[in-house]
């Protein structure tokens, strides 16, 4: 999750010890073993570090260049949950990150941030723009014991169990529900300028925040739009570089 003190506050082993000093050398070894192929160093930021750009830059200083930092998704009363004040800080941080990335690119030391990867000339087809990741229909999560779920974030939620690897999909009702979950399934999305970038958002995030896969995770929505704004700004700036 970036800085040692941030990572070790939550990424602990069974004995409660922080993991930073053990995982960083292993991450470096993994990236080296990739032999130049792509990878992503992914972290999560919480109420403890809304200034998450410091963690992104820390990863970059360690030598990692393909990075992703995701906002935490949890119940509003969870100590890790982002507050309304945090959201304003995070939005400012996204701008700081975009400007820093442009500077690094000019200096010949670029880094990639997953959420700023935006193709304005090609990009996904209209079906993908509407349907998004395809959880529950185009792909599923398979548990070690053979059960099928719409995606890994639903594993353990029995009502979302689709079937198993022996009998296949037997819960057609749930699959149909996911098939109809798209950018046009939510009233809140009807007039949103970003709906064909987010495809209605993550079904799992919506469910965990609202109790329905057709709900809208408002905080995530707000941050997503800010990320797209920054990504578009970067595209414009890169045209002049």
Residue locations for each model-derived region?
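C-terminal accessory region of radical SAM enzymes
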Residues: 89-122, 152-199
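Short clusters of hydrophobic/aromatic residues that line enzyme substrate/ligand-binding pockets
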Residues: 7, 133, 162-165, 178, ...
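Active-site and channel-lining beta-strand-loop segments
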Residues: 138-153
């Amino acid at each position: 999750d970036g800085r040692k003190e941030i990572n070790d506050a939550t990424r602990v082993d069974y004995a409660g010890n922080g993991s930073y000093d053990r995982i960083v050398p292993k991450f470096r070894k993994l990236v080296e073993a990739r032999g130049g192929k792509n990878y992503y160093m992914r972290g999560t930021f919480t109420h403890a570090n809304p200034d998450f750009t410091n963690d992104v830059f820390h990863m970059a200083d360690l030598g990692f260049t393909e990075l992703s930092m995701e906002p935490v998704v949890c119940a509003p009363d969870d100590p890790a949950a982002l507050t309304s004040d945090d959201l304003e800080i995070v939005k400012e941080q996204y701008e700081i990150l975009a400007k820093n990335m442009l500077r690094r690119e000019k200096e010949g030391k670029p880094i990639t941030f997953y959420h700023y990867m935006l193709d304005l000339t090609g990009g996904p087809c209209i079906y993908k723009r509407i349907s998004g990741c395809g959880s529950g229909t185009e792909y599923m999560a398979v548990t070690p014991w053979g059960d099928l779920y719409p995606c890994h974030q639903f594993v353990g939620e029995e009502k979302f169990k689709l079937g198993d690897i022996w009998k296949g999909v037997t819960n057609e009702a749930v699959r149909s529900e996911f098939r109809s979950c798209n950018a046009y399934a939510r009233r809140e999305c009807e007039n949103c300028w970003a709906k064909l970038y987010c495809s209605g958002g993550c079904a799992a995030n919506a469910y965990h925040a609202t109790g329905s896969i057709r709900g809208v995770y408002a905080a995530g929505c707000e941050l997503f739009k800010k990320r797209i704004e920054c990504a578009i700004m970067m595209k414009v700036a890169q045209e002049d570089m």
